[in-house]
């Protein structure tokens, strides 16, 4: 049964993880086998599809009743921006969830800041369809 406060609980736990591992987040977390998982170390709690033939910087996670529903990765930088959008296009991704804090100094912008504004990355044209802001998070 879904609890009505599950989103708040996920956000609380995410904040707690970041606070507890402040300087070591994405750097020191290891798997049970003590092997690094690259930029996805913080997703150890999610069941991954390890047999997939994708780049190691991406991790596919199943949804409730849909296989490979979510594509998880770190925020792209200038060098990995095209690879990020290529993978999103290849996997037919329409929803992107960014767990890192949003501020005006994002490492590298990879989508439009305003609705209906177009962001271009080589042959890809990315349009922000909608945006909404709540107390704990921003939905774009």
UniProtKB/Swiss-Prot annotation:
Annotated InterPro entries: Prot-tyrosine_phosphatase-like (IPR029021), PTP_cat (IPR000242)
Task: Specify the Tyrosine-protein phosphatase domain's residue ranges.
Answer: 1-140
A molecular function annotated in GO for this UniProt entry is: protein tyrosine phosphatase activity
Family, according to the entry, reads as follows:
Belongs to the protein-tyrosine phosphatase family.
Q: What is this protein called?
A: Truncated tyrosine phosphatase D1
Q: Which organism is it from?
A: Microplitis demolitor bracovirus (isolate Webb)
């Amino acid at each position: 049964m879904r609890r009505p406060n599950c989103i708040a609980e996920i956000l609380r736990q995410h904040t707690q993880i970041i606070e507890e591992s402040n300087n070591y987040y994405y750097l020191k977390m290891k798997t049970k086998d003590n092997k690094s998982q690259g930029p996805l170390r913080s997703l150890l709690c999610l069941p991954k599809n390890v047999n997939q033939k994708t780049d190691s910087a991406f991790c596919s996670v199943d949804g409730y009743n849909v296989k490979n529903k979510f594509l998880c990765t770190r925020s792209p930088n200038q060098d990995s921006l095209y690879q990020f959008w290529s993978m999103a296009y290849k996997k037919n991704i329409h929803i992107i969830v960014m767990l890192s804090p949003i501020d005006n100094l994002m490492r590298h912008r990879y989508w439009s800041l305003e609705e209906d504004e177009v962001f271009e990355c080589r042959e890809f044209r990315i349009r922000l369809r909608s945006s909404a802001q709540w107390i704990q998070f921003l939905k774009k």
